[in-house]
């Protein structure tokens, strides 16, 4: 299960409300979603796609966190208050990444192949942020709450804001 103990320690490090490993194991939906993902991912790699997706959907129903079994997730992912988190099929996540509630790591089209973001190590993605497309987010990047990221972010950078622009004129 790719070092459950390490994942529990990460939660204890990052969440001041976490008191002990048993509490984290039994009561933290981010851990439950991650455990289900690890099993679903193993099934997905062995081409048991339907069973993997079924397990993924069960985990989503129970936790409110949707992780596609095809995603590649490193060690020590911490999903805090994970309701509404979506991690797409071709997403790649490095080690010691922190994701808050309402985050989408999603695609921008329906084409096959790599269409979701790649996050480096020690990335923090704030609540409600949307990181979209086959982009690369470097190591040690901070993405602010509700930011919309559509292009690569270099190592050590901070991204904030949701800049929208009008694409049609008023009539």
UniProtKB/Swiss-Prot annotation:
The keyword Acyltransferase applies. Its main location: cytoplasm. GO terms for biological process: cysteine biosynthetic process from serine. GO terms for molecular function: serine O-acetyltransferase activity. It comes from the Bacteria. It is an enzyme of class 2 (transferase). Keywords: Acyltransferase, Amino-acid biosynthesis, Cysteine biosynthesis, Cytoplasm, Repeat, Transferase. InterPro entries: Hexapep, Hexapep_transf_CS, LbH_SAT, Ser_AcTrfase_N_sf, Ser_O-AcTrfase, Serine_acetyltransferase, Trimer_LpxA-like_sf. It catalyses: L-serine + acetyl-CoA = O-acetyl-L-serine + CoA. Pathway: Amino-acid biosynthesis; L-cysteine biosynthesis; L-cysteine from L-serine: step 1/2. GO terms for cellular component: cytoplasm. It is found in: Cytoplasm. The keyword Metal-binding does not apply. Its EC number is 2.3.1.30. NCBIfam families: cysE, EPS_EpsC. Belongs to the transferase hexapeptide repeat family. This is Serine acetyltransferase. It comes from Helicobacter pylori (strain J99 / ATCC 700824). The gene is cysE.
């Amino acid at each position: 299960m790719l070092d459950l103990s390490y994942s529990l320690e990460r939660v204890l490090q990052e969440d001041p409300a976490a008191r002990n490993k048993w509490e984290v194991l039994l009561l933290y939906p981010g851990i439950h979603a991650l455990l289900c993902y690890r099993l679903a991912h193993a099934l997905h790699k062995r081409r048991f796609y339907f069973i993997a997706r079924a397990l993924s959907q069960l985990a989503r129903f129970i936790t409110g966190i949707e992780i596609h079994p095809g995603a590649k997730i490193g060690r020590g992912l911490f999903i805090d208050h994970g309701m509404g988190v979506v991690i797409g099929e071709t997403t790649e996540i490095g080690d010691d990444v922190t994701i808050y509630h309402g985050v989408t790591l999603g695609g921008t089209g329906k084409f096959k192949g790599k269409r979701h973001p790649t996050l480096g190590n020690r990335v923090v993605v704030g609540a409600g942020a949307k990181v979209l497309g086959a982009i690369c987010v470097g190591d040690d990047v901070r993405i602010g709450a509700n930011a919309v990221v559509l292009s690569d972010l270099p190592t050590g950078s901070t991204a904030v804001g949701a800049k929208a622009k009008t694409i049609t004129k008023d009539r």
